[in-house]
């Protein structure tokens, strides 16, 4: 099933890209464990990495600092490798409240979570791809360092079926139940199976659009066919098929029985300790909770909060690292850490917070001490387990530079010839009025502006002031969730408004070619929001536009400002020199606005679950201009139905896209009428 990586792109490597690709590949082939790619904003770092993957033909994991950037990277990699397995692995929780105890108020908070089914399916698809083939790119968030089912147990639980094999129907049903599939003859959905006579239909947990039909005759598998679970249309037959477990945490029965004995032993030891310390309430609480879990495991094969017993279920010793996505990556895999100056510190910070919460639960008798081993990896464990690594950032941190021995692969020259923004420093006293006049210059020529402030209060006041002066402005703050944030960025690019005000949200990786001006208020207030790295990242948001400019408002030039200005000027000089030598004229980027929302709920395939297929979002392009008023009215009515369908299915990004089309069509309808 494994193919070779085939890179699809209308462009060839240019600028600094060929040299960067050559150096990275040489380093990997020479066995270098760590390399750093210092690539400026808009220099095509993702394209460089895609070329390295395609040339070396190695399975790759790309770590991103958050879901927004992971979504953006997933969309880009999917375009580069349409024939290969590009997978997405982020936390599947839409909402997560971990189990916790607050001793001061004697409050126990139960675990509460809302799981996104679509992302769960994509996680299962990612691990399946890593186990089955080599042409895999998995784009992951820091969720990759959290415990996952043991790959050895996961492989043991798989159900292999081949045409002609002798197997009893009841044996298949029993195995499906062990894989945690549920029988549902009415509603056929992911992770279920149905039985009709000698025919068993299975909807694999890792699939979103293909189901398996097993046809038996006299205890023999007569035919295995793949079909569309929605329409029932048979796509074709296969000689063999492997059904993977419904969850990563599935465990064979004999392992559960063994784990239960080990849990009982630990409970007995812990009870002695608690009684010796006169903690009678804690002892009673722990006994009651653990025995309830053991009974549930005995009857059902799992229990609520079974992850707290993961050490026993995976057969690990005390303190050993949990199995994670890294255990599924082949030994010669490649790790790419995007925006490494943010992602690397995140990896280091996950373990301690988790540990502090669980220690309280153990101390007060809510959990056994072994629950402490259900945890994310420690940083040292991550370092020991990580394969050959490429750190990618416009502003690498001290850790990456140290690991790379101070050597960096420079990618400063952009293929488009675009230069780093011109930087001006202006006084603070008149910053708001000066900003207003600059905004008006930009909006007059249909360009966008980003403004970054130091405090939430100032951002709110500035937004209000700009609105009073007739500017179309929005304010981006930490209370806005990921999806809404992506919508706001998309609306800025579409021209629904012209100015976006934020604090620390307008930085890494955000791809907005329409932005020609970045204004940094109070740039001379030294601190983490105005550090050299933060300033370079924020200035970089204007680097995708031909007229890119950054204005730093400050009464003095701080060391951070001086370094950021110096680095930007160094890059700009190198870029100008390259353009002059090669006769390149800088060109703006014409990036499709839908790109940032490529992930969506259905990832390019907008499917309404259980309610029939929603039509793919159609562009309200040139054809709409030629329509008659009656045809336009019909089209508007049709799209309104689609929009409501998407909204009902919680597919808000698709609904928002159709809303924008409706806005354009209504304007055309008014003009035509």
From Swiss-Prot:
Residues involved in ATP binding: 39-46
Main subcellular location: cytoplasm
Record-linked Gene3D superfamilies: P-loop containing nucleotide triphosphate hydrolases, UVR domain
Motif Beta-hairpin, residue numbers: 92-115
Gene Ontology MF terms: ATP binding; ATP hydrolysis activity; DNA binding; excinuclease ABC activity; helicase activity
All residue ranges annotated as the Helicase ATP-binding domain in the record: 26-183
Superkingdom to which the source organism belongs: Bacteria
Pfam families: Helicase_C (PF00271), ResIII (PF04851), UVR (PF02151), UvrB (PF12344), UvrB_inter (PF17757)
Keyword Cell membrane: no
Record localization: Cytoplasm
Function as written in the Swiss-Prot or TrEMBL entry: The UvrABC repair system catalyzes the recognition and processing of DNA lesions. A damage recognition complex composed of 2 UvrA and 2 UvrB subunits scans DNA for abnormalities. Upon binding of the UvrA(2)B(2) complex to a putative damaged site, the DNA wraps around one UvrB monomer. DNA wrap is dependent on ATP binding by UvrB and probably causes local melting of the DNA helix, facilitating insertion of UvrB beta-hairpin between the DNA strands. Then UvrB probes one DNA strand for the presence of a lesion.
UniProt comment concerning the protein's domains: The beta-hairpin motif is involved in DNA binding.
Xref: NCBIfam families: PRK05298.1, uvrb
Protein name (database record): UvrABC system protein B
Organism whose genome encodes this protein: Klebsiella pneumoniae subsp. pneumoniae (strain ATCC 700721 / MGH 78578)
């Amino acid at each position: 099933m494994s193919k070779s990586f085939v890179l699809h792109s209308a462009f060839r490597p240019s600028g600094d890209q060929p040299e960067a690709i050559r150096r990275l590949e040489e380093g990997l082939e020479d066995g270098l464990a760590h390399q750093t790619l210092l690539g400026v904003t808009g220099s095509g770092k993702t394209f460089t990495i895609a070329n390295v993957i395609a040339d070396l033909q190695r399975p790759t994991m790309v770590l991103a600092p958050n879901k927004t950037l992971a979504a953006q990277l997933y969309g880009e990699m999917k375009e580069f490798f349409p024939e290969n397995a590009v997978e997405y692995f982020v936390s599947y929780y839409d909402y997560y409240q971990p189990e916790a105890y607050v001793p001061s108020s004697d409050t126990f908070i139960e675990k509460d979570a809302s799981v996104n089914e679509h992302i769960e399916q994509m996680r299962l698809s990612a691990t399946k791809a890593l186990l089955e083939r080599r042409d895999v790119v998995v784009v992951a968030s820091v969720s990759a360092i959290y415990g996952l089912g043991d790959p050895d147990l996961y492989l043991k639980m798989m159900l292999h079926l081949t045409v002609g094999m002798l197997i009893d129907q009841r044996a298949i049903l029993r195995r499906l139940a062990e894989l945690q599939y549920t029988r549902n003859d009415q509603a056929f959905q992911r992770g279920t199976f149905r039985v009709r006579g000698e025919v068993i239909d299975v909807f694999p947990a890792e699939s979103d659009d293909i189901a398996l039909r097993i046809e038996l005759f006299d205890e023999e598998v007569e035919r295995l066919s793949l079909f569309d679970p929605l329409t029932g249309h048979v796509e074709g037959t296969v000689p063999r098929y492997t059904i993977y477990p419904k969850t990563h945490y599935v465990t064979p029965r004999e392992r559960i029985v063994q784990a239960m004995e080990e849990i009982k032993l630990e409970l007995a030891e812990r009870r002695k300790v608690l009684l010796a310390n006169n903690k009678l309430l804690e002892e009673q609480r722990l006994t009651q909770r653990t025995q309830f879990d053991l009974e549930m495991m005995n009857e059902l094969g799992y229990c609520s909060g079974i992850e707290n017993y993961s050490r026993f279920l995976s057969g690990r010793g005390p303190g050993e690292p949990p199995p994670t996505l890294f255990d599924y990556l082949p030994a010669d895999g490649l790790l790419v850490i995007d925006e490494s100056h943010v992602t690397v510190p995140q990896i280091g910070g996950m373990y301690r917070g988790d540990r502090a919460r669980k220690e309280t639960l153990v101390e007060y008798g809510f959990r056994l001490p072994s629950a402490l081993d259900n945890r994310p990896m420690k940083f040292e464990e991550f370092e020991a387990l990580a394969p050959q690594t490429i750190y990618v950032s416009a502003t690498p941190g001290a850790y990456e530079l140290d690991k790379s021995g101070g050597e960096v692969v420079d990618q400063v020259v952009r293929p488009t010839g675009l230069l780093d923004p011109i930087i001006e420093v202006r006084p603070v006293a008149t910053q708001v009025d000066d900003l207003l006049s600059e905004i008006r210059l930009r909006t007059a020529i249909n360009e966008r502006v980003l403004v970054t402030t130091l405090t939430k209060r100032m951002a709110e006041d500035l937004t209000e002031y700009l609105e009073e002066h007739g500017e179309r402005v929005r304010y981006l703050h930490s209370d806005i969730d990921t999806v809404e944030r992506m919508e706001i960025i998309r609306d800025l690019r579409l021209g629904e408004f012209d100015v976006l005000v934020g604090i620390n949200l307008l930085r890494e990786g955000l791809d907005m070619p329409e932005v020609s001006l970045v204004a940094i208020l109070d740039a001379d207030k030294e601190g983490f929001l105005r550090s050299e790295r933060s300033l370079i990242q924020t200035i970089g948001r204007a680097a995708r536009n031909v007229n890119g400019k950054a204005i730093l408002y400050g009464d003095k030039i701080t060391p951070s400002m001086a370094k950021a200005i110096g680095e930007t000027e160094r890059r700009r000089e190198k870029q100008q020199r390259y353009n002059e030598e090669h006769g390149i004229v800088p060109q703006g980027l014409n990036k499709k606005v839908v790109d940032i929302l490529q992930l969506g709920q259905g990832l390019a395939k907008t499917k309404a679950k259980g309610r029939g297929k929603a039509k793919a979002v159609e562009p309200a392009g040139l054809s709409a201009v030629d329509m008659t008023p009656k045809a336009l009215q019909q089209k508007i009515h049709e799209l309104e139905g689609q929009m409501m369908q998407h909204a009902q299915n919680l597919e808000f990004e698709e609904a928002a896209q159709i809303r924008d089309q409706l806005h354009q069509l209504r304007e055309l309808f008014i003009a035509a009428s």
